[in-house]
Amino acid sequence: DNDGDLDLFFANGHLNSVSGDNRQSNLLFKNDGTGLYTDVSKSSGILDTGQRIHRSAMFADYDNDGRIDLFVTVNGQQVEDGKGNTIYDENQGKGILFQNQTETKNNWVKIRLEGTKSNRDAYGASVSVLVNGIKQKQFLVSGQGYFSNHAQELYFGLGTSIVIDNIEVKWPNGLRQSFEGVQPNQTLLFVEGKANYHKIK
């Protein structure tokens, strides 16, 4: 919802076992900004896909509308008879794409990094965003789930703030770069060592 408070999503599914149903429902919890989380799995539509063997969740703004979407990988449901025979339910292994349709007027910024002296993907870098005295910090890492990875960009919800006071990039080699007075609601590319960033959207 771009309010600056990170919510929690759980991709659930039991490990394959000799007997029993391994399918489970995903869960989504909304952060109210005070450290309390409310279960919004039903109202958000997360439960509409039913119970499956979910394995990992990948976050990205798939449709570039400024709202983070969610793709969940799914294993086929496995049933064993104890004699070495295994049956998989059909159409249970397809991934699920959840499009974020939250009605919000909150602002956001997406940040992409390109290393020059550091690795080109800038893995290991961190980005801090300061808005109205509140700092958010994220790290760009590789391999964040079971055979999956989030989009190679960092996404920050900014609430109703109309300007970003400061963006600081710390590159893997220790170089720090700071940028002030950045406008929200755009995708920005920061290249290591360059004094200016590039607007992508």
Predicted regions and their residues:
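Residue-level marker for isolated small/hydroxyl-bearing positions within beta-strands
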Residues: 9-13, 71-73
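Beta-propeller blade signature
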Residues: 25-32, 95-99
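Short glycine/acidic-enriched loop and turn motifs that connect beta-strands
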Residues: 14-17, 77-79
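Beta-rich catalytic cores
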Residues: 24, 53-55, 93
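Blade-edge beta-strand/turn elements of extracellular beta-propeller
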Residues: 35-47
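Beta-propeller blade termini
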Residues: 1-2, 54-64, 73
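Gly/Ser/Thr/Pro-enriched helix-cap/hinge segments flanking short amphipathic alpha-helices
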Residues: 44, 67-201
